[in-house]
Amino acid sequence: MTRSLKKNPFVAKHLLRKIEKLNTKAEKEIIITWSRASTIIPTMIGHTIAIHNGREHLPVYIIDLMVGHKLGEFSPTINFRGHAKNDTRSRR
């Protein structure tokens, strides 16, 4: 189910505070966050946010097409290594 339109989009308060502080300074620096569930809002456009994927923080530059999506969508948590090699010797 999608979130009700009566409610506002979820953004972690600590992340929102950091973005508003950088917007008043007009400085660009990487914001580190573990909040993958936060929704991208228009005030985040132009910032680089390092999103935690379970092992490291992946920097993501926010553009206008990302508004409305969650931060976790842009930092993959699983690295697909490929399917197992088809080994015919082990079957015999």
UniProtKB/Swiss-Prot annotation:
Taxonomic placement: Eukaryota, Viridiplantae, Streptophyta, Embryophyta, Tracheophyta
One Pfam family named in its UniProt record: Ribosomal_S19
GO molecular function: rRNA binding; structural constituent of ribosome
One Gene Ontology term, aspect cellular component: mitochondrial small ribosomal subunit
Gene from which the chain derives: rps19
UniProt cross-references to HAMAP family, sorted A to Z: Ribosomal_uS19 (MF_00531)
Keyword Phosphoprotein part of the UniProt annotation: no
Family statement: Belongs to the universal ribosomal protein uS19 family.
Protein name: Small ribosomal subunit protein uS19c
